[in-house]
Amino acid sequence: MAGNRSIITLECKTCKERNYTTTKNKKKTQDKLTLSKYCPRCRKHVEHKETK
């Protein structure tokens, strides 16, 4: 049986580079996920938004 969690990628809002992958429960959080993570290209903490 497959679970409700799916793998998503997080994209930097400033440079648009896809730096991180994580899992998300689609039943509980249906809106797009945004997290503050470190971007090695920007060299600072920036908001990362969920992409496919």
Curated annotation (Swiss-Prot):
Keywords: Ribonucleoprotein, Ribosomal protein. It comes from the Bacteria. GO terms for biological process: translation. Signal peptide: none annotated. The keyword Signal does not apply. PROSITE patterns: RIBOSOMAL_L33 (PS00582). GO terms for cellular component: cytoplasm; ribonucleoprotein complex; ribosome. Pfam families: Ribosomal_L33 (PF00471). InterPro entries: Ribosomal_bL33 (IPR001705), Ribosomal_bL33_CS (IPR018264), Ribosomal_bL33_sf (IPR038584), Ribosomal_zn-bd (IPR011332). GO terms for molecular function: structural constituent of ribosome. Belongs to the bacterial ribosomal protein bL33 family. PANTHER family: 50S RIBOSOMAL PROTEIN L33, CHLOROPLASTIC, LARGE RIBOSOMAL SUBUNIT PROTEIN BL33C. This is Large ribosomal subunit protein bL33. It comes from Anaeromyxobacter dehalogenans (strain 2CP-C).
